[in-house]
Amino acid sequence: MYANIYDFQTGKVTRSDIRASLEQNKNVMTVLCDSLPSGLFSFISISDSVFFCKESSPDFTQQKRYLAGKTAGMLPPVIERLNEAKVSDSKDINIISTIAKMSRVNERIVEMPIGLNYINIYSLNGDFARTVCVGDELDDISEIEDRKEWNRMYTYADLRLFKDFWGVVSINEDKMTFQTGRKKYPSILLFDWDGKPLAELKLTRFVNSFDIDMVNKTLYVFDVYNDKMFAYDLSEVLNKIVRE
């Protein structure tokens, strides 16, 4: 069992041999790459020699996606389009920040923003691209720029990928309410790998994160207000949405 780790401060990528580390009671690490820039907004290890990176443009108005490494190929058109998103000069670049993860099953990447109402799914080989919008229309970045920061929406938190589907925590509250006293219970939205909605799990606790034990068909959520974890039987939902 291995884990590839990106050091945010140095840009170095190392591979940790987890089993050897446990057996030897020390970190067993191998340097895979020492030439990536520090401070990347996103990093995904595609392989031991190819890395998906998202880096700020020099003027801090865009976040540029690219592949780095020995055998990195050309970018598909979908990434070029995503790289066109930008904020105005001196505006908050985090408006277009996303959390990106890649499925090892189908090699599709999901990018979940924290302040926009749409999520992008795409493959690096260019054979699939889709945008999932939770709302009547896509958020306009320029309109969000014009709002005071406290009035901007906190849309999603936590992104989890599974074999047959993926999910996010939907917050949907403005930042002031979220920071000073949440009022709306969040929900967990589940989608298949083509972006089709599968289920909405409505919660009665103020959670920011979740995970699903697929073997025991159990949903785990963490309540940020009382530092407690809760478990729910998810067998009925999973029996409907998971292929045998």
Question: What annotation goes with each model-predicted range?
Answer:
Residues 48-58, 164, 168-184, 229-234:
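Short, conserved, GDST-rich strand-edge loop motifs in beta-rich repeat architectures
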Residues 2, 6-53:
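Asp-box/WD-like beta-propeller blade repeats and closely related beta-sheet repeat scaffolds
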Residues 15-35, 71-96, 125, 129-151, ...:
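Surface-exposed loop and turn segments in beta-propeller and other repeat-based domains
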Residues 31-48, 92-107, 112, 151-162, ...:
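Structural signature of eukaryotic scaffold interfaces centered on beta-propeller domains
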Residues 211-244:
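Blade-level signature of beta-propeller repeat domains, shared across WD40, Kelch, NHL, RCC1
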Residues 5-13, 19, 66-75, 123-134, ...:
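Short loop/turn segments immediately following beta-strands, especially the blade-tip
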Residues 3-10, 60-71, 181-196, 236:
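Beta-propeller blade signature
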